[in-house]
């Protein structure tokens, strides 16, 4: 059984990967500003400058693969397909967040 997967580097694939990196960067910059304004409580360790790592690695995952992050997990969650609004709502402590506003930056999870 072969569990490896090759990502085709077509122009469309490359553009999709780039767009995901941009989504992560924009989301993280917004969260950093919100944290400075006191809207995000607790620690908020952003993934700025590391976007390509998650996007490149996660491009090789299957949709049913499970991911556990230990540090700066926002980019991982977004690269795996978490909607940015769910991440932002989570860090704002809202019920509409991926962890119903209870996990925050350090304990993201999506059932």
Go through the PLM ranges and name each one:
Residues 1-17:
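Charged, compositionally biased N-terminal leader segments and the immediate start
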Residues 12, 35-36:
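Short hydrophobic/aromatic segments of transmembrane alpha-helices and their interfaces
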Residues 19-35:
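N-terminal glycine-rich anion-binding loops that anchor highly charged ligand groups
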Residues 29-33, 39-111:
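Cofactor-binding active-site loop characterized by glycine-rich and histidine/acidic residues
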